[in-house]
Amino acid sequence: MDVREVLYDCLRSTEQLAEQRKLCITPCFDEKPVLVNCDEVQLRRAFTNILTNALRYAKEEIQIECKADRGKAIVRIHDDGEGIAPELLPHIFDRFFSTRKGGAGIGLSLAKEIVSLHKGTISASNDGGAVFEISLPLRKTT
């Protein structure tokens, strides 16, 4: 499956929320397919959970990168919001952890679980806003 197509599906499904918040989403994807073995529905759910968080906290813009690098598919979702408080970073993937009133705290923990099931990694950091980076093994070509 081409990760770029999964991301485009996520962008289409969150387009209305982005328009309501007057946010610009800038995709920067490799020109060539970024192929991984995956459960497309589950991977879409993981990306959508992360993108929805970015849509909640971004001020004006979200950048989404997708590239192949050293045998990995790298997806980076970067918003221009306040970022994640340093003391919260170690907990954001914990099940039921939420800083939002009424938040269930399931979205990011589910995203991490899905990425892990695909033999990938996910991390969060701050760089002028929150940055989520997902790394998945590329599909081996024969």
Predicted regions and their residues:
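Conserved micro-motifs of the catalytic ATP-binding
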Residues: 35-38
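A conserved beta-strand-to-alpha-helix junction within the catalytic ATP-binding
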Residues: 1-12
